[in-house]
Each structure stands twice: as structure tokens, then as C-alpha cells.
């Protein structure tokens, strides 16, 4: 029986609907009001009534308004043309919305995610008679710098035989590419695009692997001390202004991945505008073209309706999984998951659910876990490997890492890059705290060496705290030297200049080379007459290494500075 319904109550963006017939959880409905149809999603079903969250402002919705049921879940359209686009959480292209509406978006306006008129040069790789299943490749088109594979839609569960496939040529996303037939004789037309529900993970692959290969970000403190694996997860919690967004932008520019997807969910409009302005101007170091050519941005600012924040996170991860199915490495950056959690708290309050800690819903942990679990590295049907690496920034109030969203995130991620106000105020960027952060993954430098260096940093911090109480005079010259060496490691290796053309991106080879130099200094014993001499010597070392960081690796000036450094170390080193 086809469902019918009418509005019986409105609280904020939660609408209560009286229904006749059957409906399903998470079904999309349209509320007819004032000549417009507003999109909403059913989030609770009760006897004879359902509650739906509206993805638009609910102004004007009245008791008695009619409801149109779609019998479909919230979906995204997948196909060539997603890259270099900027979408809202419902996959409306913002550039086209702006062209139609101007600065202020109209309610009830939903546009096609893909350009229906653009023709793509299709190259067939399958042939008539081939047996295919969901996720198998039929051909490819060139999208920017990648080969965009045209696949059998993931919702096709049977084994099919190709009975017709077009010759190489130019086609739109709606043109027929192939016809497949199942064992029962049922035929299906394949086009370049299809829809997939955002809350359902894509599972058209052979096997799931344990992440092990490092995703090189070319940021020293991450790759060496707190690495992220391809297909792994990491979080970047930190207070406002600590550099979360800049760190994510640097990572997206230099990371060893094929496609970057940015979900700006609930960030301040100014920050989102900054991202939208800067990204087209950023040059991809690998191709020399705009970084936008391999980037897709899903943005929902804090001024947009809260329900669309949740949609934007799921839309982004689904697009990421789609490109993973092509054997590509994907990096998804969610900024910030705290705003998404706040949207859940708002809806939970309106549903009158029993609140958990700080009024967040009791199921907060399981929802956050289900999002991060969609990251991973998989073996595809053809034996190739694809990965989705997920990094979420968290904005805890006052930088308090004990709050529920940060704690729920820490339980499921593989690396924790904790930014602190203390380091950002001291202008130590990236402001990742080396004593609080951690990672479960393998890095580009041997773990024994990094473990030794971290213990050195901890000792240096203890001595620094002691010096704040008793002063420099109250500690031995040996302890003072440990403190100076830890400061040297911090200044020359943990800190990095994102605005310098050389220091912004450091290759794994260079990281190993520079770390070995510093490791040797940490392990060496030096002889000094007094603390002033020790400080002067370490400052000289620091300036020399900082100059090396700003010069191209193993070129003439770099080699000259290295020789000077070796002579300096040799002059004060104790021989045994």
C-alpha cells in the first residue's frame, strides 16, 4: 500500500508526520509547503506516526501539509565529474546553485550532482560475452589526472553476461554504455552514473587488509613520530586557532594519495570560504596543476541546517569509497566532527531521548565508530588494492581532550595528533604535542630510534618544569644539556615551516637522513666548562640544522652546511 501522510507537529527542524501505510527507516520524504517540496529523512517510526529531520529551514511548514514518500534512502550520484566540484551535504553543486539563486540559497531547490550535457571520452576494456559482477570494470574515462573506471553498479548482486557494449567514443553520463543479462534472462542498461545510499558501506571487493604501508604526508612530526597508514584512521583534536585547518590543507597538498575529499561539516563560514578560495590556487606538487583537479569538497557551514551536517559526512565517505573501488588511494578529511556530533545532540534533544554525557546521545560512540570503520584498505575484484584513509579534526571546547567526542574518537582511530594551545601560542607549528600524541602504525623511521627520541623529549620536559621552580642554577650541567638537546630536536625536527618551498614537504629519504644526524647528537656526550658555553654551542647547532632544512637536499649548500655541522660536533664530542 502506498504511504500517505500529513504534518501534525513541528519542533525546530524535526517534523512529526501522521501516516497511513508502510514506510522504512531513513526513507526520504518531501514536505509540500508554500509551493515548494522540502527534503527530509525519517529518523524514528512510531505507531501511526514518524519523525523526520528536515534538511532545510522549516519556516512556513504547517499542520496539515501533505507529504510525498519516495521509498528511497538518502543517496549520492556516483560517476565521472565529481572531482574539482564543491557540493553541499545533499550533493547540490554550489556553483550552479549560486548561478540560479545568487548569494542566498532558495529552499526546496535540488540540482543534479553531475553535468548531464558534458561528453566523456569512453574507452571500453570489457567485451561482449564477458561475465561481470558488481564493481567490475567495463571501461574508463579520463577525469583530470586519473583514469575514472566505469563499473557495474554496486547494487547488482548477481553474476551477469555482457550482451552489448558501446564502441570507444564520446558519451554523456546518461547515455547507454552497456547492456548486461543475468541467468534468468533479465537485462539491465548500464550508464556511466548510478546512485548509492550514503549510510550503506560499499562492499564490492574481495578482501579487506590490515593497514600497514605508511601514508607519507611529508610532515616530519607525523611521518616519523605519529605516522598514518594507508587505509588507516587518525584524528586531530585541538582548540580554536591551534592550526587544525592549516595542518589538514598541508596534508592534503603533500600526502601520497590520488584523490582528496574534504568534508567541511559545520565549520565557521569564514574558514570554509578560505578553503574554497585557497584550494583552486594551490598547486599539486605531483602534476603541476591545480590541487582542485583531484579534490572534491563537501561543505556545510555552521549557518546551514544541522541535519545537512550529518549528510555531508556520509556523502563524503561514500564518494571516497567509490574512488577506492578504482584501485586509488583516497584521503578524506572531515573538519570538524565535533560539529557533526553537536548536530546529533540537537536532534537527540528534540526526539526527547535519554541524554548521555554532556547531553550527547548515548549512541554517540557507535555512530562515530561506524563512520571511521568505513576507512580501510581492500583487495578489489581484479586484484588491485584501493584505500580510504580518514582523518577527522575535533574541536573540543577549551581544548579539553576529556570531553565525549574526543574520547569516543580516540577509541576507534589508529593515530592521535593532539594540538595544544601551549605550542601554538609559542608559535611551534605544527602544534602537535609530542608527549600526548600517539600512533599504532609503522612510520618511515625505525621505532627504536623514535622511541629513544620521545623519551629524550619527555626527560627534557621534566627538566624544563624543574627549571621553572629552581632556575638554571639549581640543576646539573648534565641535566641542562639533556634539556638543550630536547629543545634542539623540537626546533629542528618537530617544527616545520609550511610557507617555505623546501621545508613544507620533506621526503622520507630526507627525514631518515636528518633524523640520523639528530639521533647521533642526542646519543653523543659533550664536554663543556659551563652552561653558557653549552647553550652557545647548541644554539650554533640549531641554526646550522635550520639552515639545512631550508636548502634542497644534498645540493652544494646543503652539503657545505652538513660538513660545518660535523666539524662543530666533532670539536666538542667526548671520545671513548
From Swiss-Prot:
The keyword Transport applies. It is an enzyme of class 7 (translocase). Keywords: ATP synthesis, ATP-binding, Hydrogen ion transport, Ion transport, Nucleotide-binding, Translocase, Transport. It catalyses: ATP + H2O + 4 H(+)(in) = ADP + phosphate + 5 H(+)(out). The keyword Ion transport applies. Belongs to the ATPase alpha/beta chains family. PANTHER family: H(+)-TRANSPORTING TWO-SECTOR ATPASE (PTHR43607:SF1), V-TYPE PROTON ATPASE CATALYTIC SUBUNIT A (PTHR43607). This is V-type ATP synthase alpha chain. It comes from Borrelia turicatae (strain 91E135). The gene is atpA.
